[in-house]
């Protein structure tokens, strides 16, 4: 398994990563929801809403959410956009899709169980908007995913994604990251030496270079954002620890110890009983603009 190979200091394969992601998502289905809906920028927008801002309701009507998870983003779309919008979601995890289907059970939304690299059932140039919320970071291999997105995106279509931001750009984030990783490394010494997925997504510069290679002649914008969540130290510690994949490999006993360590950290930084968690993200927006862009493969 992925964890065994990490433990032995070996390099896990793409299949090991997939198996590991399935294990985590089966055990903690919907785990990113709470923190992602709660963390907001200064104008009160969370990361789902930052993606929705990239839609032009006058010219876009067909939206695909790639790695849609438990369906939160599609639920936002369903509430915001008129009934003539065509919404669909793809995810590789059955349990997440079950949650998404039950959340949107009365709606005319298509869900597909598939990997992002294998979307042969979606026609060329058929989607106005493709969203990917917090999942590009975990896709391996990533280049086939980007090529697929380019293939199925219409001319004038938009591809928008939320990915990890710079660790140093949000106050306190690095400290929290380090508390979690140091704790996990006491039990799994090699954990964190190898990141999940493609490391190029984790830096603005390398992400920009990678996307430009695939989407040449398209408009590409990557913007950094810091999203914040205020809560009591205990609540914040629980929510924040569950947002990091690293902490989800722990046994329940160790997990509780980690949560109490985080709670102590938030306690020290609290003001009037409330602490803050600041989350750095990058928003990638690609607009498929030119004829050349859509014709070249």
What name fits each language-model region?
Residues 2, 6-10, 40-43, 197-210, ...:
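Conserved Class I S-adenosyl-L-methionine
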Residues 2-57, 72-76, 96-99:
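Conserved class I S-adenosyl-L-methionine
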Residues 62, 157-158:
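Short glycine-centered segments of the SAM/dcSAM-binding site in methyltransferase folds
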Residues 64-66, 70-119:
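Class I SAM-dependent methyltransferase SAM/SAH-binding core
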Residues 121-130:
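A short acidic, Gly/Pro-enriched loop at the edge of an enzyme's catalytic core
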Residues 129-142:
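A short SAM/SAH-binding and catalytic strip from SAM-dependent methyltransferases
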Residues 143, 158-227:
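Conserved catalytic/acceptor-binding region of the Class I
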Residues 143-155:
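A short glycine-rich, Lys/Arg-flanked "PGG" loop and its adjoining helix->strand segment in the class I
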